[in-house]
Amino acid sequence: MRKETVRNQRCAGTKADFLLALFIGRSPETETACPASSGMKRSGIEVCTAGEWVATKEIKRLQRIKMIELWNVNKTYETGNKALRNINITVEDGEFVFIIGRSGSGKSTLLKLLLKEVEPTSGKIIVNDMNLGKMPRRYIPKYRRRLGMIFQDFRLLKDRNVYENVAFAQRVIGASARSIRESVPTMLTMVGLSSKYKFYPQQLSGGEQQRVAIARALINRPEILLADEPTGNLDGHNSMEIMKLLDEINKRGTTVIVVTHSHEIVDRMKRRVITMDRGTIVSDEKKGGYTHED
């Protein structure tokens, strides 16, 4: 496909499509494998142009690249609690995965392992070709920037407005003032909060607060978005609106993993469902529903 054709296809979408393509997953300037005979080379790595990036994401999806791999992972806490037992999971680049199960089944421990908040007792965890067990401690903060995280309780800074909450995530990684001025308004437009950038968290609804949290999680263009009960404090309508946003984000290439207890959301979305119980995986359905009994 010629560059002009790819670029024209990319520009044919809506403004929201463009914003999502720009900010979700890897940016157009990310160093990644480009289609054969295209792209420039930087230090031996081919670099895609903006138009080629979209086509490259499709190529990667077709190649079914593994984003996350857990091999025989076990986690026993110092208390003796065996949180995870012989966990084997592969999540491909661009997948949307639900993880369900009753409280204490190991779901949160699984997310903590991916964030490197805790270490496995045994086994191997690979994220985007990186062996987390061999990762130097000094590299962990940089690694975590490649992950986005949203929580049930939003975890917003109550004394800062919407704009400042999202900008904070860029300031902590040393982003320039110019970068913040350009990227934060764009991200707020993407999540539908451009008109409320001066509002404080207590002035927003629960659904709006979660949108701020999503914008903050995505502002640094993560490859993976982890969501721990993202709709737990929301009503049915706002829950589905948040899931529609996560679904759209996923369709633009970001790998999304959602821990939830919501039967309605899981049944309606029809995505991959991993069910956990007592630290083990009891089922893994590619397009499942909520079959676990609480």
Q: Where are each of the predicted segments found?
A:
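Catalytic Walker B motif of ABC-type/P-loop ATPase nucleotide-binding domains
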Residues: 225-228
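A short, proline-enriched helix->beta-strand linker immediately N-terminal to the Walker B motif
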Residues: 219-223
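Conserved ABC ATPase signature
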Residues: 200-204, 208-210
